[in-house]
A protein has these predicted regions:
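Compositional signal for N-terminal targeting/processing segments
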Residues: 1-233
Length: 233
């Protein structure tokens, strides 16, 4: 069995993520990270200083959102890593190399698309003025429409940051399932549908735990607003 646990990188999900992992006692826990980003999460400065400009923009944006939830972006990945260690399970870093991915993105993205991305300043692009809570609820109901809009406005960004990474992570899970009967993957909720489609098409047994299932508690601070988030980790 492969279990896909869909998370949000700016929410406090540590306890719930660990609960789902402990419940399944997997032999391997997969993380939506590459080695460099995993070690950056373990370091005090989070390793953003040398990251590409667009990555730093998006990461800083997520930092500001996460402050309202009392967490640091990526805490759910560290929680999953800690749970794996408690279970003596293997840890698999299944995402593509972030540095190479963003280098490709900058190389292949047309100037007009770059201009739209930078000019938007990320926030307020699709749904200006909506609270984080309102936007998350809409995304949870219909990721397909969200990614369709992204694909029209930023086709290169969607292809490289979403579609190609979904394929890469799904292939990694297929290989791991060949040697592990019980696999848990912790990744951004926006990746779940795409990876689920690939895995089910290959006839693999898959179950999902979605972000809306994990978010049983609401944050004390609810004043942050945003219009656009792109899963980058």
């Amino acid at each position: 069995m492969i279990t896909l646990i869909g998370t949000g990188h700016v929410f406090n999900l540590r306890a719930r993520v660990q609960e789902e992992i402990f419940r399944r006692v997997p032999s391997v826990v997969c993380l939506e990270l590459d080695p460099a980003r995993y070690h950056a999460l373990r370091s005090p400065d989070r390793g953003k200083g040398k990251a590409p400009l667009v990555y730093r923009m998006l990461a800083n944006f997520q930092d500001r959102l996460a402050e309202g939830y009392g967490v640091k972006p990526g805490d759910e990945m560290l929680a999953a890593s800690d749970a794996a260690k408690d279970l003596a399970a293997s840890i698999a870093l299944i995402d593509k190399d972030a540095q190479q991915t963003f280098q490709r993105l900058m190389k292949e993205m047309p100037f007009r698309e770059k201009f739209r991305l930078v000019g938007s300043s990320v926030a307020g692009l699709f749904m200006p003025g909506k609270s984080v809570e309102d936007q998350v609820k809409e995304l949870e109901q219909d990721y397909t429409s969200y990614f369709n809009v992204m694909g029209k406005k930023f086709p290169t960004l969607k292809r490289i940051l979403i579609d190609e990474r979904n394929e890469h992570m799904a292939n990694a899970l297929v290989q791991l399932h060949g040697s592990h009967q019980n696999v848990v993957a912790v990744l951004g909720d926006g990746h779940v549908d795409g990876i689920l489609q690939i895995l089910t098409a290959k006839g693999l047994p898959v179950e999902t735990v979605r972000l809306k299932d994990l978010r049983t508690e609401r944050p004390a601070v609810g004043t942050a607003t945003t219009g656009f988030t792109v899963e980058t980790s």
